[in-house]
Amino acid sequence: MSWIIFYTIIAALLILDLGIVHKKNTVIAFKSSVFLSLFYFIISCLFGIYIYHNMGLDHAREYYTCFLIEKAMALDNIFIISIIFQFFKIPTTYQHRVLFFGIIGVIIFKAIIIYGGIMLIHKFSWLLYIFAVILIATGIKTFNVSHKTYDIQNSYIYKSIIKNLNITHNLEGHKFVIKRNNKLYFSPLFVSLILIETIDVVFAIDSIAAIFAITNDVYIIYTSNIFAILGLRSLFFCLSEIVERFSYIKYSLALILIFIGFKIFMHHYIAIPAYISLTVTITSLLLGIIASIMRKNMIDHK
């Protein structure tokens, strides 16, 4: 029953998103984007209350912790998505269409990765320690890297697409696939969609590794992941400005990843309850936001 309720909510949100709010290919206003993302955030929080009533306080804490971590980590690939759109010269009017179908792919791929990961961890529990090393290494690396970059032309996926598919250099409206002379051609919209899906899968490895350290409940992991991504995709059109404004969030995320990595190594000696993980996550993010605001105010007053 819980799965039916979740998928019903997601289906309703997707229908609302593409069928009503973005039925026409128009540029999404900043205020509309913020409002829609806030709407998704409220729905996500209400779903956490539903989990609390049906599964208990600890599961609700795990849900909110996973949700916030996924939200923060998903911010990291916004720049790369923006680079992909710029590279293929995708107009703003069509970007939402690509992101929407990207969400459909994420819903499928996340399910495969999460179920596969849970099965592997149950069979090979030592994999958690590998995840811990990945998380700590990623956290340390985040402190030393100012911006993520993505070399599209030299990426394996892009080269494979160009080599094996008929690609058009120009857009034909909002079409992903075009038929010419009994041949199928794929537009830049299609190529950008494939690259974004690939990026989502790569980024999912870090985020899922972090969340496995919080809980191994498939329902909590999957629902928190999907709700976090839904809200971010709707906010994409103003997110570059927000990410620039909150430039220290990445350091908050680095601290969270390192904390979770050490939590995995210490779980045999110290049982860290869900409320501590949630407290560390919220505190780290708030400190990052406050530090970012203070930095921006100092720059503005110079």
Swiss-Prot record:
Superkingdom per UniProt: Bacteria
Keyword terms: Cell membrane, Membrane, Transmembrane, Transmembrane helix
Keyword Transmembrane helix appears in the UniProt entry: yes
InterPro entries named in the record: Integral_membrane_TerC (IPR005496), Integral_membrane_TerC_rswitch (IPR022369)
Topology within the bilayer: Multi-pass membrane protein
Transmembrane segments: 1-21, 32-52, 67-87, 98-118, 120-140, 194-214, 218-238, 253-273, 274-294
GO annotation, cellular component aspect: plasma membrane
Keyword S-adenosyl-L-methionine listed: no
Subcellular location: Cell membrane
Entry similarity comment: Belongs to the TerC family.
NCBIfam families given in the database record: R_switched_Alx (TIGR03718)
Protein name stated in the entry: Uncharacterized membrane protein RT0774
Organism: Rickettsia typhi (strain ATCC VR-144 / Wilmington)
Taxonomy of the source species: Bacteria, Pseudomonadati, Pseudomonadota, Alphaproteobacteria, Rickettsiales
